[in-house]
Amino acid sequence: MKLKFDLKKKNGNARRGQLTFERGTVQTPAFMPVGTYGTVKGMTPEEVKETGAEILLGNTFHLWLRPGQEVMKMHGDLHDFMNWQGPILTDSGGFQVFSLGDIRKITEEGVHFRNPVNGDKIFMDAEKSMEIQKDLGSDIVMIFDECTPYPATHAEAKKSMEMSLRWAQRSRDHFDKLENPNNLFGIVQGGVYEDLRDVSVKGLTEIGFDGYAVGGLAVGEPKEDMHRVLEHTCPQLPEDKPRYLMGVGKPEDLVEGVRRGIDMFDCVMPTRNARNGHLFVTGGVIKIRNATHKTDTTPLDPHCDCYTCKNYSKSYLHHLDRCNEILGARLNTIHNLRYYQRLMESIRKAIDEDRFEQFVEEFYARRNREVPPLGKQA
């Protein structure tokens, strides 16, 4: 079904809303854990839900290569395959193709590349991406686009953005031809160039989508550039449609995204960092493998209500990490995912109570950091 987006409240640029799908509701601003291969690494769907997650991100490119469309269709769709009955957003595969580097060739038609799993020559285009995502049963389908690399000259970024716009139209046309009852999001490109972002927004809104993502950020550009692009782009996006900042990011990035009008985020950071022993807490980050934690019998974060913090000490988590025990990665992941969801809950509450900027000040004060400057207000 078509999603319903209710924008309930604004506090400055920060937006408080709700996404309603056939499979459930999602409170925004929202963070989506990443389940690349149909699993949030090391977690059962029940455990992910327990952390407060209401929507997951799946990866079109990787699920197409393994297990493939036929296996997916045998189960029904990705929801049935992985036993997650909440909403799922799938990225189109564009970013993964971008990440392949030398083993891919991008043309107007699409992307030729070698399968990183077995070396086979394969081809992906906008139409194929729409077909795969329909088979996945994605509640939110992303258009096929090219992620503009950083750094890129204005001419390079313009050429890439214009091709992404043509691919956006092809994605829209094929999505409609397939009679997909779900939702299609456009992706704004244009690198760090505001004039190119303007052209991209205009082109995408003329085509018309159910939501709009800001892509091509967090690919190596300075934070100031990311903030500037968001400040410039977000006010131009339709007020009544959800806004999604792709692949971002650190807790600070989520706060800064919300300050500039973003509703949805995804990132591998909480799960990947958990497996590397980098754990997010109220005051910043704890590196659990550091020797100082060997004899620390206190929980990771006294403010955290997750299963890990309620039951285990830093000393135990340090021990598991040093011994490379699988349980260590699992407990760390539970904690980091819950940290991210608690952060989003706090953000939503602050917007509800008209004190979001006060929340921002307190957030940075706990980290002993200055609040980054905020540019023009919408």
Swiss-Prot record:
Record GO terms (molecular function): metal ion binding; tRNA-guanosine(34) queuine transglycosylase activity
Q: Which GO terms describe its biological process?
A: queuosine biosynthetic process; tRNA wobble guanine modification; tRNA-guanine transglycosylation
> Highest taxon of the source?
Bacteria
UniProt keyword terms in alphabetical order: Glycosyltransferase, Metal-binding, Queuosine biosynthesis, Transferase, tRNA processing, Zinc
Cofactor(s) named in the record: Zn(2+)
Spans traversing the lipid bilayer = none
| Matches recorded under Gene3D superfamilies | Queuine tRNA-ribosyltransferase-like
Region (RNA binding) residue spans: 247-253, 271-275
A cellular component term (GO) from this record? cytosol
Its EC top class is transferase
The record describes how the cofactor is bound as: Binds 1 zinc ion per subunit.
Enzyme Commission number, as recorded: 2.4.2.29
Residues engaged in binding substrate = D91, S92, G93, G94, F95, D145, Q189, G216
What pathway, per the record? tRNA modification; tRNA-queuosine biosynthesis
Positions of the catalytic residues: D91 (proton acceptor), D266 (nucleophile)
Q: Which reaction does it catalyse?
A: 7-aminomethyl-7-carbaguanine + guanosine(34) in tRNA = 7-aminomethyl-7-carbaguanosine(34) in tRNA + guanine
Q: What family, per the record?
A: Belongs to the queuine tRNA-ribosyltransferase family.
Quaternary data: Homodimer. Within each dimer, one monomer is responsible for RNA recognition and catalysis, while the other monomer binds to the replacement base PreQ1.
General function of this protein: Catalyzes the base-exchange of a guanine (G) residue with the queuine precursor 7-aminomethyl-7-deazaguanine (PreQ1) at position 34 (anticodon wobble position) in tRNAs with GU(N) anticodons (tRNA-Asp, -Asn, -His and -Tyr). Catalysis occurs through a double-displacement mechanism. The nucleophile active site attacks the C1' of nucleotide 34 to detach the guanine base from the RNA, forming a covalent enzyme-RNA intermediate. The proton acceptor active site deprotonates the incoming PreQ1, allowing a nucleophilic attack on the C1' of the ribose to form the product.
Tell me what this protein is called.
Queuine tRNA-ribosyltransferase
Q: Which organism is it from?
A: Vibrio vulnificus (strain YJ016)
Gene name of this polypeptide: tgt
